[in-house]
């Protein structure tokens, strides 16, 4: 489970797959991008302020070790899904729902691709709500971090979501540290939202 690798202060090398552009019609579609290589690059040893008033956490992992995962696309105006056999990463996150449940005969992870157009958002929500698996759980990764927490890093930040193979939900704050370079500002395990509450939020 890669949540043990993506601990606070861990440095990673990674190029996020590009956002996929398709017709924005609310459809539920399979994710198309493969995962790009993510590698552990030690720990961030720079002077910390705010969130980082603590010693660096050292994770015993060889430098340049791969961090294996499946990538789930964000497809604006659609809900993308991927079959879950391993840990799944997706992002960057702003306000989208990430969900997990049985769909088309197997366990899937979903990224509901909301956009700034409310008409399209209503389509996306209505379509996904109608197909919401009976065992669905979900979370909103961006809600895990406050503006103050992000500002305390003194870095440009983005959020990625992790759904572990065992069904755990995590929100990971990434701090930009150069082209293709990040360090983990923090990781939070997020309690799942269950189907009745998801239905209400998608109404």
Where are these regions (language model features)?
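Active-site microenvironment for binding and transforming phosphate-containing groups
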Residues: 1-203
């Amino acid at each position: 489970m890669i949540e043990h690798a993506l601990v606070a202060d861990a440095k990673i090398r990674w190029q996020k797959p590009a956002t996929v552009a398709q017709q924005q019609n609310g459809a539920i579609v399979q994710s198309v991008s493969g995962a790009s290589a993510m590698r552990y690059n030690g720990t961030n040893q720079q002077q910390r302020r705010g969130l980082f008033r603590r010693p660096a956490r050292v994770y015993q992992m060889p430098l340049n070790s791969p961090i294996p995962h499946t990538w789930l696309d964000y497809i604006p105006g659609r809900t993308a899904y991927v079959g879950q056999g391993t840990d799944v990463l997706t992002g960057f996150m702003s306000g989208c729902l990430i969900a997990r449940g049985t769909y088309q005969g197997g366990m899937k992870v979903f990224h509901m691709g909301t956009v700034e157009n409310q008409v399209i958002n209503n389509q996306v929500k209505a379509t996904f709500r109608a197909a919401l698996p009976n065992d669905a759980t979900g979370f909103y990764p961006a809600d895990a971090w406050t503006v103050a927490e992000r500002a305390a890093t003194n870095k440009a930040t983005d959020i990625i979501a992790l759904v572990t193979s065992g069904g755990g939900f995590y929100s990971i704050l990434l701090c930009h540290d150069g082209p293709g370079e990040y360090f983990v500002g923090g990781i939070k395990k997020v309690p799942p939202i269950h189907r009745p509450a998801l239905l209400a939020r998608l109404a």
